């Protein structure tokens, strides 16, 4: 049985491939666009059966000529995740139409389809629950994800031929994101800031939040891969699910966890947030004008629906997840 993973050389996709490998599954077709060549490193430690260029894959899907038999599932992680990309034509073709074509093909072939949605569909809302009236995306990236989620809702009412699951990822961090540049997680950037300069920067006050007090639902990519595989194991489950921890933690906590993990590797003692700020190991910079009115200052996944679907595993909190990630970066990127 073959499994297809799109975006397989990317951040979340490569972690799903790795998680499948840990189960002994290697009959995997990895689909990606390696024009950004350094992404190959994410697959170098993985076992796959074949690599297929994204554009060739799309052509074969649209023409119904994919040569693989007995496809067990498609994990669709290939998309543009740059929330600052305002090219609507590109975003809608890459995120919406590509996903729609894959959905149609999977439904025709009765293949389970698990895809990446995003918490960006909620915009600046304060309630993050999988309900239409709570969804007001702020940018074309969020809209592209939102629009496809509406397609799934309609298809579910009409009746599905095979499982379809959309995961609304919250703030994901962890190994294999180094190719993402400015779109990599704050933890990734703080690790390199601290290693280079001996301190990290956070946004100052904005939108009623104090220095570094903006909060997000930070979720480890290890947990994201686990949830994907849980639904792979339960093909009777379909729908749209938030994928976060259900906790909202301050950027201050994230920065402190990163700095203290780096300090621990240097044999230095843990410091409190107050001490880190006083010693200027955490510094605050003015909030950028370009982000005002477009920035989610608070996110917290309502994971009631995920729990009701039977997923019982605990999620890493910021400290434990960041500790694991920093150790990985020290071993692989430093």
UniProtKB/Swiss-Prot annotation:
A single MF term (Gene Ontology): ADP-glyceromanno-heptose 6-epimerase activity
Keywords noted in UniProt: Carbohydrate metabolism, Isomerase, NADP
Details of cofactor binding: Binds 1 NADP(+) per subunit.
Binding site for NADP(+): 11-12, 32-33, 39, 54, 77-81, 94, 145, 172, 180
Cofactor(s) annotated in UniProt: NADP(+)
Subunit structure: Homopentamer.
Catalytic activity: ADP-D-glycero-beta-D-manno-heptose = ADP-L-glycero-beta-D-manno-heptose
Ligand binding (substrate): 171, 182, 189, 203-206, 216, 295
Catalytic residues in the record: 141, 180
Pathway involvement of the protein, from the record: Nucleotide-sugar biosynthesis; ADP-L-glycero-beta-D-manno-heptose biosynthesis; ADP-L-glycero-beta-D-manno-heptose from D-glycero-beta-D-manno-heptose 7-phosphate: step 4/4
InterPro entries in the cross-refs: Epimerase_deHydtase, Heptose_epim, NAD(P)-bd_dom_sf
NCBIfam families found in the cross-reference section: heptose_epim
Family affiliation: Belongs to the NAD(P)-dependent epimerase/dehydratase family. HldD subfamily.
Organism listed in the record: Neisseria meningitidis serogroup C / serotype 2a (strain ATCC 700532 / DSM 15464 / FAM18)
Highest taxon above the source species: Bacteria
Gene3D superfamilies in UniProt: NAD(P)-binding Rossmann-like Domain, UDP-galactose 4-epimerase, domain 1
Keyword Nucleotide-binding part of the UniProt annotation: no
Function in brief: Catalyzes the interconversion between ADP-D-glycero-beta-D-manno-heptose and ADP-L-glycero-beta-D-manno-heptose via an epimerization at carbon 6 of the heptose.
The enzyme's E.C. designation: 5.1.3.20
Entry remark concerning the domains of this protein: Contains a large N-terminal NADP-binding domain, and a smaller C-terminal substrate-binding domain.
Name this polypeptide is given: ADP-L-glycero-D-manno-heptose-6-epimerase
Biological process terms in GO annotation: ADP-L-glycero-beta-D-manno-heptose biosynthetic process; carbohydrate metabolic process
Enzyme class: isomerase
């Amino acid at each position: 049985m073959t499994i297809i993973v799109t975006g397989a050389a990317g951040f979340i996709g490569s972690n799903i491939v790795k998680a499948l490998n840990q189960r002994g599954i290697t009959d995997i077709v990895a689909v990606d666009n390696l024009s950004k060549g350094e992404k190959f490193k994410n697959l170098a430690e993985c076992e796959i059966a074949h690599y297929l260029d994204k554009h060739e894959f799309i052509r074969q899907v649209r023409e119904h000529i994919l040569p693989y038999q007995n496809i067990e599932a498609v994990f669709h992680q290939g998309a543009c995740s740059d929330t600052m990309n305002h090219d609507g034509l590109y975003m809608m073709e890459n995120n919406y139409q590509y996903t729609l074509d894959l959905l149609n093909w999977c439904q025709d072939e009765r293949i389970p389809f698990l895809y990446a949605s995003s918490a960006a569909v909620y915009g600046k809302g304060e309630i993050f629950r999988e309900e239409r009236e709570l969804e007001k995306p702020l940018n074309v990236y969020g809209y592209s994800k939102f629009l496809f989620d509406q397609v799934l809702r309609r298809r579910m009412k009409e009746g599905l031929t095979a499982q379809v699951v959309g995961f609304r990822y919250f703030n994901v961090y962890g190994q294999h994101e180094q190719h993402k540049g400015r779109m990599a997680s704050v933890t990734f950037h703080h690790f390199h800031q601290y290693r280079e300069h001996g301190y990290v920067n956070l946004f100052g006050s904005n939108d009623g939040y104090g220095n570094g007090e903006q909060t997000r639902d930070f979720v480890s990519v290890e947990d994201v891969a686990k949830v994907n595989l849980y639904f792979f194991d339960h093909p009777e489950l379909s729908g749209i699910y938030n994928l976060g921890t259900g906790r909202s933690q301050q950027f201050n906590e994230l920065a402190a966890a990163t700095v203290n993990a780096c300090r621990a590797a240097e044999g230095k003692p843990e410091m409190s947030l107050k001490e880190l700020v006083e010693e200027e190991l955490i510094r605050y910079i003015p909030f950028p004008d370009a982000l005002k009115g477009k920035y989610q200052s608070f996110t917290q996944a309502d994971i009631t629906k995920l729990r009701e679907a039977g997923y019982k595993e605990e999620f890493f909190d910021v400290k434990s997840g960041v500790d694991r990630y920093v150790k990985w970066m020290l071993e692989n990127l430093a």
